[in-house]
């Protein structure tokens, strides 16, 4: 977690950034589950590292094991089954085949004068959106980026859009994604 608005405020950070193990208790009862849970795996389980600090395997093997442990818990929870949405995505593409160009006309901004590692963007990645509001086997051809996801979350919670998410013309998730009872 590297947001200066969080880490530069230790008391706030201590109250709001909690260990992942707490999620197990939060999921036990729908009323305990926060309306928004943002999970970032540690550096061992984020799919990047070739090995973990303890010498165990990292990379895709570690992230797959991590997801096998946590995703079923989330999907079985009452809160998720009632009205939840689980989005699984990556922060950037990686590897010799990756294309680091930006999606969706993303340009430079104050927070990211050169988005991406090799150029303007983090490359092409996918997102898996699981919810009762998404029909199985849905495939959207609309190009989205991380700001689209942020803007979609802000719309759901009726929040003012932040940064690049408020850029005119930026697509947010619509009926191509939420295509099963979203507005019913």
Description of each model-found segment:
Residues 1-184:
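N-terminal pro-sequences and low-complexity stem/linker regions of secreted or lumenal proteins
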């Amino acid at each position: 977690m590297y947001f200066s608005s969080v880490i530069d405020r230790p008391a706030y950070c201590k109250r709001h950034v909690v260990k992942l193990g707490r999620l197990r208790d939060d999921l036990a009862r729908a009323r305990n589950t926060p309306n928004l849970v943002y999970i970032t795996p540690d550096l061992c389980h984020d799919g990047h590292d070739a090995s973990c600090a303890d010498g165990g395997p990292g990379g895709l093997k570690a992230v797959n094991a991590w997801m096998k442990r946590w995703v079923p818990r989330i999907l079985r929870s009452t809160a998720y089954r009632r009205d939840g949405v689980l989005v699984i995505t990556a922060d950037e593409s990686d590897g010799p085949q990756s294309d680091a160009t930006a999606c969706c006309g993303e340009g430079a901004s104050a927070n990211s004068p050169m988005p991406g590692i090799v150029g303007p963007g983090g490359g092409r990645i996918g997102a898996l959106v699981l919810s009762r509001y998404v029909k199985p086997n849905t495939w959207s051809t609309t190009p989205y980026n991380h700001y689209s996801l942020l803007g979609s979350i802000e719309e759901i919670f009726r929040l003012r859009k932040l940064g690049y998410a408020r850029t005119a013309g930026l697509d947010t998730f619509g009926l191509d994604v939420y295509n099963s009872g979203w507005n019913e």
